[in-house]
Amino acid sequence: MLTVDNLEKTYDSGDRALKGVSFEVSGNEIVAIIGPSGAGKSTLVRSINRLTEPTGGRISLDDTEVTGLEKSALRDVRRDMGMIFQEFNLVERLTVMENILSGRLGYLSTWNAFRRNFPPEDIRRAREILSRVNLEGVENNRADELSGGQRQRVGIARAVIQRPKILLADEPTSALDPDTSREVMSLLTDIAHEDDIPIIINIHEVDLAVDYADRIIGLSDGEIVFNGPPDDLDQAARDEIYRGGESIADREEPSAGNSTDADDVIAERGD
């Protein structure tokens, strides 16, 4: 179970991007985070694994409190949190298979990680996941040769090969066309149910949230103003979520696509 308790994010300027956010996620629940641009959605998702450092509150995954962990312990817990990025965060010069296997780098010794010497079980599982995300036949293609939908599937496969306890997806469909967006959401739904893990998805497209999520959390100006099933997201609830214009986080919230180099990808895998 993931527990977020009274989470706060205050920037150096004194502006508050998250204001006492609390919720729990468990089982194979798919939770969509919606809200206007700058409401704090990316800040929230990225605070869970401390890509963005919260300034108050508590985050725990099962029996491990994530907030306050030192560097080595944080690396360990990040292995249990698969991250899927808006801008894919692939290493462009590497092949599809190499990008997927990078999700296992944190489990290797320093020497084996440097040489990318993966055990046979990791390679077998990578091939299995290739089939699962419909990337058979392109495993030897470089990442920069792929379409947007294929690139996001590689990102999903890289997260899944970690065997995480939870998946965090930061706007996974924002760079995709409508049909491909639905394919990606369907794939994430299948993964949640088949692997029995929860997924938290920051998403702009309300219709996708309604169609694919089990629960929707609506953020407005850094606060939860809706938390319930899609069927309860009536027009009044939508008006409450989207009532404002530009918020603090529009000016301060970092883009989910800012960390794109190989070191950040490897760090995110837990190495």
UniProtKB/Swiss-Prot annotation:
Part of the ABC transporter complex PhnCDE involved in phosphonates import. Responsible for energy coupling to the transport system. Residues 2-246 form the ABC transporter domain. ATP binds at G35, P36, S37, G38, A39, G40, K41, S42. Coiled coil: none annotated. The complex is composed of two ATP-binding proteins (PhnC), two transmembrane proteins (PhnE) and a solute-binding protein (PhnD). Belongs to the ABC transporter superfamily. Phosphonates importer (TC 3.A.1.9.1) family. This is Phosphonates import ATP-binding protein PhnC 2. It is found in: Cell membrane. It is a peripheral membrane protein. Residues 243-271 are annotated as: Disordered. Its EC number is 7.3.2.2. One of its GO terms (molecular function) is ATP binding. Residues 243-254 have a biased composition (Basic and acidic residues). GO terms for cellular component: plasma membrane. It catalyses: phosphonate(out) + ATP + H2O = phosphonate(in) + ADP + phosphate + H(+). Keywords: ATP-binding, Cell membrane, Membrane, Nucleotide-binding, Phosphonate transport, Translocase, Transport.
